[in-house]
A protein has these predicted regions:
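Generic detector of well-ordered alpha-helical segments enriched in charged/polar residues
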Residues: 27-32, 152
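Conserved alpha/beta-domain cores
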Residues: 39-218
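Conformationally flexible catalytic loops at phosphate/diphosphate-handling active centers
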Residues: 1-8
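Feature 9007 captures long, charged alpha-helical oligomerization segments
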Residues: 33-37
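Beta-strand/loop-dominated core regions that host nucleotide or nucleotide-derived cofactor-binding catalytic loops
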Residues: 15, 22, 29-31
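Surface loops and adjacent helix of pleckstrin homology
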Residues: 21-23, 125
Length: 218
C-alpha cells in the first residue's frame, strides 16, 4: 500500500517510520505515547519557573548561550539568570561586508536590554578553525584550529577589532556587560586587548559618548 492509498497515517517522529492504516492496537499505543510526551512537556514547563537548586539546596545560576538575536525571540528573560555567552561570529558572516560599529552596537544593545539588568557576556570574534570568514581569516593556514584565530586574529587586524571594542563599550551603558576574549594563550595577548580597549574608551570619551568599562574575562 502507498501513502496515497491510505486513509490514516501515523508518523513516528522518533524512528522516522510511517504506519499506513494501522490497527487499533497500534493507534492506541501511539495515543498513549502522545499523552506521555505531553505530560513530560507540562512537567518540564512547570519547572522552568522554579529556581535551579540542587538536592542539598545549593542554588545554581542558569545562563543561556546564544548565537544571535533569533535565539531570544521566544525566550522569557525571567526564566534565566542572564546570557552566559554571545557568539559574535554571526555578525561577520551575514553579508559581503564586515559589520560596522553601529550595526554591532545595535545588536549588542538589544541583547543587553533583553536581559533586563541581568549579566551578559559577549565574546569577541572567534573566527578561524571551523569558522572561516571570507576576507578575514587566513586561507590555507597549516593549523587553522590553533593558529591565527580568536584573539590572535583580532590583534592581527586591529582596525577590525577596534570597531568591535567600540561597539561593546557603547553598549555597556545599557546593562552589566562582560567581555570574553577567546583563545588567549599568553598574558601579553590580554595586555594588548586591554590597551586597545583603553584607547577605544578614551576615543569615545573625546567624541562625547557615555561609556562604562565592562569587565574583561577569559
Amino acid at each position: 500500500m502507498s501513502s496515497k492509498d491510505a486513509s490514516f497515517v501515523i508518523v513516528d517522529g522518533a524512528s522516522g517510520e510511517a504506519y499506513l492504516d494501522p490497527k487499533q492496537v497500534t493507534r492506541e499505543e501511539f495515543q498513549r505515547r502522545q499523552r506521555d510526551d505531553q505530560e513530560k512537556s507540562n512537567r518540564a514547563a512547570a519547572l522552568l519557573e522554579k529556581p535551579a537548586v540542587t538536592a542539598d539546596s545549593t542554588s545554581i545560576s542558569m545562563l543561556v548561550n546564544i548565537a544571535g538575536l533569533d535565539d531570544l525571540k521566544n525566550l522569557d528573560p525571567s526564566l534565566c539568570d542572564g546570557i552566559g555567552l554571545v557568539r559574535t561570529e554571526f555578525l561577520f558572516g551575514e553579508g559581503p561586508d564586515l559589520p560596522n560599529e553601529d550595526t554591532q552596537y545595535d545588536v549588542y544593545r538589544q541583547m543587553i536590554e533583553w536581559a533586563q539588568g541581568r549579566p551578559v557576556t559577549i565574546r569577541t570574534l572567534d573566527a578561524g578553525g571551523d569558522k572561516p570568514i571570507k576576507g578575514l581569516t587566513i586561507d590555507g593556514e597549516s593549523n587553522p584550529f590553533l593558529g591565527v584565530r580568536g584573539v590572535r586574529l583580532s590583534l592581527a587586524r586591529p582596525e577590525i577589532f577596534r570597531v568591535q571594542l567600540r561597539a561593546l563599550l557603547r553598549a555597556a551603558v545599557h546593562g552589566p556587560l562582560k567581555v570574553m576574549v577567546p583563545m588567549v594563550t599568553v598574558p601579553a595577548e590580554l595586555d594588548a586587548v586591554r590597551m586597545l580597549m583603553g584607547n577605544a574608551y578614551h576615543d569615545l570619551k573625546r567624541e562625547g559618548f557615555t561609556v562604562a568599562v565592562p569587565a574583561l574575562g577569559m
